[in-house]
Amino acid sequence: MTNETTKTQRAIMAVVAVIGGLYLMLLAPTQAMQTLKIALDQVLLRLVPHDADFYPAVPILSVTFSAWIIAFVFAGALLLVLSKKLYEGAKWARAAALGMFAIPSVAGMTMMIPWFVLVLSEYPEKGVPAHTVTGMPPSMPILFVSLLFYFIMLLADQDTLKNKMLKVVPYTLLGIVSGMVFMNGQHGARYFIHIPGEFVTDASGLISVNPTPPPFTSPLAHYITNLDHLDWRTFDMLSDKAVYSPQTLALLLGGFLLYIASVLLIVSIPLMAMKNKVGWYMATASALATAVVSFQGFVVRSSTEWLQGGLLSSVLLVVLLIPAFKNLLIEKGE
């Protein structure tokens, strides 16, 4: 980003930082928590009794939503502290503010998908009753408010129209890919930690806790070894003898590596805004890693979500390597 800004632009950025900071500290956490509670209520009462595969969504969403909520408060506090420096025209403050608004922008995206999958979607083939909640999630404003402030921070300078149009591409893709790989990470982590033997279908046909789960000494009780004995689609027993399953590695990388990459992509945004080469290398490596892992997940699990994630990561990788974009993100020759 160029550091050439007018007094009006600096005032706008300072006001945006104050409004955005207050929003992230005072309103966004409540909106996110309301979304989480409604989603978990639907999972526990509507979905899990008919399909135990949904249960891992409970700990996964509890942890990730909580992490985002905590990040909102810290980001909001930093934005308030940065507002004076933004008005003074400090480039580093603007880069930091851009990164702070990237956090809720990505988080807002990741909070939409669980709502559609767990709250609004119908699963009649599993015997799941119709949904009782309608409309958009309470967290939806987080996405759009944060995106608005994100682009104000990105574009409020005296750069040429051409350069502004060019830099919108990588800075938008960074957020989209970060959100996409995080959502795919939810899917991977959900199935990675799932232990099917902990659940059983009772006499009424509903899912309940298995009164005699696999003992802790059994490979069926561990998330690294259980799929070597089970059919990964139905979780039926295949063999007492371990048969190496590529599913475990695909889920590990397609879950936790994608989580880490999502965070690294967010961190790279303020670094590249300062034309720090570490940010570009971080983002490029993350795009490459997530492309490879996502395509691997698609091959192993035939998951179209991972195919989409792999394609988006590939697009980001190409964009970061194109000189017209790269020269806006780091100094020439680095």
Language-model features: locations:
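Topology signature of small-to-medium multi-pass alpha-helical membrane proteins
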Residues: M1-E334
